[in-house]
Amino acid sequence: MGKWKPESLPQKIGYRGWSTLGMLGLLVLYPLTVLGFATRYYASKLDSTRTRLGVVGVTALALVVWGALTVAWWALSTMEQLDIPFDAFLAVAAASGVATLSTALAASAKKFGGRLMTVVFAYPFAMTALFLPPVVAALVTPELEAYVLEPSYDLAVWVLDNILFVGGINEWLRATFELEGAAYAAMWAGISFPLGWFLGIVVALANLVRPSE
């Protein structure tokens, strides 16, 4: 059998068009689908914990862990031997509250919502709950700053210079906010939403290709 070759102009246009779409699908959709399969696998591991403990159990566990951290940091801030600003305690308390609430909302959206609710709410709130612990740990542990806060600062500079330069957004952010203390937690909470939506979309793409059982 010989290879078919387009002869007329419409055939040539259609042939080139479909080949271009196929190439784009191979270069773009295939890697995204593979990423979706990987994300779905690890998300299922986290979801199994939510299934065993339930929404109330997961929320209670997060409340105990984050509450213990907040109380411990408050106790340290009251010691005269340690120079810990009260603002640092408030930053830890606020991040603890956000992380606990995010855990509860992610678990609730996954349990009671459909696919749309999972993409719109569950993944972003789950990312927030995952991102905040290392950031808060770095805020209260100076030894971790070089591993968490300094790379976060470099990432913020890169995003401002290469993505948010449109319309002078980067200049406004630099003039309005200062990246220190609780601002690191706010930064990662902001990143978690677009990243969560992206991961939710690639998982939905993977489900279209091969639905999960």
Predicted regions and their residues:
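Cytoplasmic juxtamembrane interface segments
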Residues: 98-141
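Hydrophobic alpha-helical transmembrane segments
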Residues: 162-195
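Extracellular/lumenal glycan-associated context and N-glycosylation machinery
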Residues: 16-20, 24, 87-89, 141, ...
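Juxtamembrane non-transmembrane "cap" segments at the membrane-aqueous interface
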Residues: 137-169
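Alpha-helical transmembrane spans of integral membrane proteins, capturing the lipid-embedded, hydrophobic core
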Residues: 59-67, 128, 189-197
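Hydrophobic core segments of alpha-helical transmembrane domains
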Residues: 96-104, 194-195, 199-201
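Transmembrane alpha-helical insertion/packing segments
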Residues: 1-100
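Transmembrane alpha-helical segments in integral membrane proteins
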Residues: 30-44, 182-212
